[in-house]
Curated annotation (Swiss-Prot):
It comes from Chitinophaga pinensis (strain ATCC 43595 / DSM 2588 / LMG 13176 / NBRC 15968 / NCIMB 11800 / UQM 2034). GO terms for molecular function: imidazoleglycerol-phosphate synthase activity; magnesium ion binding; phosphoglycerol geranylgeranyltransferase activity. This is Geranylgeranylglyceryl phosphate synthase. Keywords: Lipid biosynthesis, Lipid metabolism, Magnesium, Metal-binding, Phospholipid biosynthesis, Phospholipid metabolism, Transferase. Belongs to the GGGP/HepGP synthase family. Group II subfamily. Homohexamer. The keyword Magnesium applies. SUPFAM superfamilies: FMN-linked oxidoreductases. Sn-glycerol 1-phosphate binds at residues 174-180, 205-206, 227-228.
């Protein structure tokens, strides 16, 4: 199994280079939007395009992936809300296990059902410990996953959860406050997790401005994911990408 995308996560982390990913929900874009998004992502030097959502009702995931692949050279990584969200045209798949919850279906149940199709797709599969953090309001992901998020002020619980995920073999930790969260994850929580986990840390949910993206990187996030804010204002793509890239250490 090829590991090009995962290796890029590892290489960038080792060099202290921070990455910016734009999260796009296939339900919320039409073919006309994709050309504009691809151009803006390319101009902003976006590192990854994450594609998926808690609910993907439409069936044009393949078309969406292929359009991005045609229009830009940015790697497309699937961020699936369910096992059905698989496209063989993508560069990689984040194989999410909701380790912050106690819903067995999202820890392993759905993975058992989806494993044959995922393997057949030939996609690069990146095992991902998904840690849902309370963002101050019920989110689609907490409702759909039927799990209780980790309280936003319980840094040690988040740390221990991420540590357990890494020791169980998860290659990546994804800390998420959920789409449209009122409050993003605190820097103190990110820092606590980063102090004990060597796997790449992805952080998303509730990040609405460039300063927050920058501070999250400084706290220990390796990849910043923004979706909801960009859906509302695509001009933020360059602003946030620049802030994330500016958080890398200065090479002498």
């Amino acid at each position: 199994m090829h590991n090009k995308i995962y290796n890029s996560f590892i290489d960038r982390k080792a060099k202290g280079i921070k990455s910016f990913a734009v999260l796009i929900d296939p339900d919320k874009v039409n073919p006309a939007d994709i050309a504009d998004l691809a151009a803006k992502c390319t101009a902003a030097k976006v590192d990854y395009i994450f594609l998926g959502g808690s609910l993907v009702i439409t069936n044009h995931l393949d078309e969406c992936v292929q359009q991005f692949k045609t229009l830009c050279d940015i790697p497309v990584v699937l961020f699936p809300g369910s096992p059905s969200q698989v496209s063989r045209y993508a560069d990689a798949l984040l194989y999410l296990s909701v380790i912050s919850g106690r819903n067995p279906e999202l820890l392993i149940g759905q993975h058992v059902l989806s494993a044959p199709a995922v393997k057949k797709s030939g996609l690069e599969v990146i095992s991902t410990g998904y840690v849902l953090i309370d963002g101050g309001a019920p989110t689609t992901v907490s409702y759909i996953s039927n799990t209780t998020p980790i309280p936003s002020d319980k840094d040690d619980i988040a740390m221990c959860t991420a540590m357990a995920g890494e020791m169980l073999g998860m290659k990546v930790v994804f800390m998420d406050a959920g789409s449209g969260a009122r409050k993003p994850i605190t820097e103190s929580m990110i820092s606590r997790v980063a102090s004990q986990v060597s796997a790449p840390i992805i952080v998303g949910g509730g990040i609405r401005d460039a300063e927050k993206a920058y501070l999250n990187c400084k706290a220990g996030a390796d990849i910043i994911v923004v979706g909801n804010a960009i859906e509302k204002e695509t001009s933020l793509i360059k602003e946030m990408a620049d802030a994330v890239h500016a958080a890398a250490p200065v090479l002498k």
